[in-house]
Amino acid sequence: MEQFYYILKYLILGLFQGLTEPIPISSSGHLVLAQHLLGLKIEGFSFELLVNSASLLAVLLIYRNDLIRLTKNGLSYIFTRAEDAKSDFFFIIYLVIATIPAGVIGVLFKDYIDQYLKGVKMVGISLLITAVGLWIIRNLRGRKNDGDLSMKDAIIVGLAQACALIPGISRSGATIVAAMLLGMKQETALRFSFLLYIPVSLGGLLLSITDIAKDPNLDTLFVPYIVAFIATFIMTYISLKWFMNIMAKGNLKYFSFYCIIVGVLTLIFL
C-alpha cells in the first residue's frame, strides 16, 4: 500500500512537472506550490534531476531536426567557411554565450537560492513578475530571424534565464520575454528559448549526477521514480507542442492572466 502511495505521488508530480515545464508559468514554482498544497514532501536528491532529464529528452525529440541542422551547418562553417552555414554557426555561439549567466549564478548562489528564495510567498511574488513580462509582450511582433541575432541579444537573454533560478520566474517566460523585447520574431524567440534549455539542463544534470548515488531512498523509490520519468516525458512533449500552437496564435496573455490569479491567491491564502 505504501508503494502504491509513492507511485501515485510521483505520478502526480511528474505530470505536474511535464505540464508546467514548457509553458511560461514556472514549473519549479508550481512544484513548490503542489508540495505545499498536497503535503507532498519529496524524499531524496534525485527527483528534480530525474524529471529534468525527462523534460530534456522530450525537448530533444521535438527539436531534433533543428539540432541536426545546427550541428551539420556549424561543422560546415568551421571547416569550409560556407557562407550559407554562417548564421547557424553563430546561432550556436550565441546559445553557448546565453548559457553562461545561469551556469555561473547557479553554481555561486545555489545554496542561497535554496535557503531563502524557495518559499511559497516568494513563488507568489515571482509569478506576478512573470505575469507582467508576459503582458508586456502580448502584442509584440519582432523582425529578427536566427541570422539577425547579436552577442548583446545572447547576453541579455542569458541574464533573463538566470532570473528563472528563482521559483516562480518562468524560464521559458523570462527568455521569451527578453527575446521579444529585443525584437525577435515569436518563432525565433521560442526556438532560441528551448534550444537554450538543452545546454543549461545538460549542465545541471552533469553537476548533479552524483546525487543519484548518494540518494538514500533510491532503492525504495526506484519504481516511483521511473513512473515520474515516463509521466514527465509524455506530458512535456504534449505541453510543448500545445505551447508552440499557442505562440503561433499570439495568445500569451492567457498565461499572464493565469500567473496573476495563482500569484494573488498564493499571497493571500498560503
Curated annotation (Swiss-Prot):
Its EC number is 3.6.1.27. The chain crosses the membrane at residues 5-25, 42-62, 89-109, 117-137, 192-212, 220-240, 250-270. It is a multi-pass membrane protein. It holds the Pfam family BacA. Signal peptide: none annotated. Keywords: Antibiotic resistance, Cell membrane, Cell shape, Cell wall biogenesis/degradation, Hydrolase, Membrane, Peptidoglycan synthesis, Transmembrane, Transmembrane helix. The keyword Acetylation does not apply. InterPro entries: UppP. One of its GO terms (cellular component) is plasma membrane. It is an enzyme of class 3 (hydrolase). It is found in: Cell membrane. The keyword Cell division does not apply. GO terms for biological process: cell wall organization; peptidoglycan biosynthetic process; regulation of cell shape; response to antibiotic. It catalyses: di-trans,octa-cis-undecaprenyl diphosphate + H2O = di-trans,octa-cis-undecaprenyl phosphate + phosphate + H(+). HAMAP family: Undec_diphosphatase. Catalyzes the dephosphorylation of undecaprenyl diphosphate (UPP). Confers resistance to bacitracin. Belongs to the UppP family. Bacitracin is thought to be involved in the inhibition of peptidoglycan synthesis by sequestering undecaprenyl diphosphate, thereby reducing the pool of lipid carrier available. This is Undecaprenyl-diphosphatase 2. The lineage of its organism: Bacteria, Bacillati, Bacillota, Bacilli, Bacillales.
